[in-house]
């Protein structure tokens, strides 16, 4: 399915809205080149992520190269008549740091990963994140939180979850990690300090360590819930 529309390079309101709202992303001397290309989403993508596919089909799409890196700008009008959207980064598979589950790779092949979002729903999964899904930024395990987690488990006399093979595919600005376990594809949030309404503690684990999202079990559930949050927010 072709979703790309030709954009006027000197009159792209969507990109100007992004530039104004995410002013820190572009440098004063950033080299910006708009491309006239077509975005194709596969039948497999549409079957795996029907809600996300519907959202993408409603988007205004701009293909842009920023400082020699390729991006797609997806833009919509929200219920308050503001332009909102995602700047998605496109990467070659050899830039990925970790082996991913097939659904994650499928998503990246079709639309890339979210580098920035703007004017988003207040409680959406994209809010306040450093990246979402981007292959080159994913990592295994909980990283610098290992000592904190060990201490919390020792204090609460809980058995540690072995998360060394979990893949973190979202990194929040406050350090929280959204991860999946590759075999089961189940999604978890590791957060030391959260104020989310959509998560719950895991039984037999210390509070403010591993959590589960309400209404989300697997990676595909997470993607579709993210899409649904935006579908309800746009016109």
Predicted segment positions?
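A surface-exposed partner-binding patch
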Residues: 2-174, 235
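Short, surface-exposed loop and linker segments with low hydrophobicity and enrichment for Pro/Ser/Thr
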Residues: 158-162, 179-184
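Short linear sequence elements within intrinsically disordered, low-complexity coil regions
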Residues: 23, 76, 109, 185, ...
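A recognition module on extended beta-rich or small alphabeta surfaces enriched in W/G with H and D/E
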Residues: 170-183, 190-230
């Amino acid at each position: 399915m072709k979703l790309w529309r030709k954009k006027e390079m000197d009159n792209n309101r969507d990109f100007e809205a992004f530039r104004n709202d995410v002013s820190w992303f572009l440098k004063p001397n950033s080299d910006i080149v708009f491309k006239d290309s077509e975005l194709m989403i596969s039948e497999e993508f549409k079957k795996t992520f029907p809600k996300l596919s519907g959202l993408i089909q409603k988007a205004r799409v701009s293909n842009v190269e920023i400082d020699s890196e390729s991006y797609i700008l997806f833009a919509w009008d929200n219920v308050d008549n503001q332009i909102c959207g995602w700047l998605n980064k496109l990467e070659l598979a050899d830039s990925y740091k970790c082996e991913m589950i097939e659904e994650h790779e499928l998503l990246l092949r079709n639309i890339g990963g979210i580098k920035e979002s703007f004017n988003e729903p207040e409680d959406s999964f994209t809010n306040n994140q450093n990246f979402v899904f981007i292959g080159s930024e994913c990592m295994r395990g909980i990283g610098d939180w290992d000592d904190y987690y060990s201490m919390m488990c020792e204090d609460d006399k809980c058995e540690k979850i072995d998360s060394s093979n979990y893949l973190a595919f979202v990194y929040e600005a406050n350090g929280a990690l959204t991860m999946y376990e590759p075999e089961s594809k189940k999604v978890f949030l590791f957060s030391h300090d959260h104020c989310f309404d959509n998560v719950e503690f895991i039984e037999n684990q210390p509070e403010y360590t591993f959590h589960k999202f309400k209404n989300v079990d697997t990676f595909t559930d997470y993607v579709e819930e993210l899409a649904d949050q935006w579908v309800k927010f746009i016109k």
